[in-house]
Amino acid sequence: MKALTVLVAEDDLLSRMVLERSVVQWGYHLASAVDGVAARELLETRSIDICIMDWEMPRMSGVEVCKWLRGSNLKNTPYVILVTSKDQPEDIQAGYEAGADDYITKPCDLKYLRRRIATVADKLQRQNACLEHARSQERAEITIAGLSPLDIYLSDLRLMRRKT
């Protein structure tokens, strides 16, 4: 399986560096943004699987990026984890309503974040494997549809002989 790409969107230099280093150590490809506009540009141009995003960033907040993302026509929309110091119930609700998939308050426990990302990565990789299997089945059905009944019968005979 290919390593997933994680976008870290954080304006605070130290926080961003810690998250970037962690993402790379955990075995994921890294994309990085210093503000919401840069995050949006990366989301438009790169295939991002998971996005770890601060709420309060210059030029465009994490919540604004979430709203834009959910309203966009992107082929691939990433799993979004908002990481923020906003810890009031109404903030958490607003984050989810904006389109965040997950919400973690600062200070961020890296062990917890790693577990969340690993869980999401596992789910995404299983979904991708299922999609690939479905595509393979569809290609096989198209191939079979182009065969004559005699070709299908002979193919079935060959398969039965292999099993015995």
Q: Where would I find each of the regions flagged by the language model?
A:
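Receiver (REC) domain active-site loop signature in two-component systems and cognate sites
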Residues: 57, 69
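C-terminal output helix
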Residues: 108-117
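CheY-like receiver
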Residues: 122-164
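Two-component/phosphorelay signaling modules centered on CheY-like receiver
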Residues: 12-31
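The feature encodes the CheY-like receiver
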Residues: 58-59, 88, 107
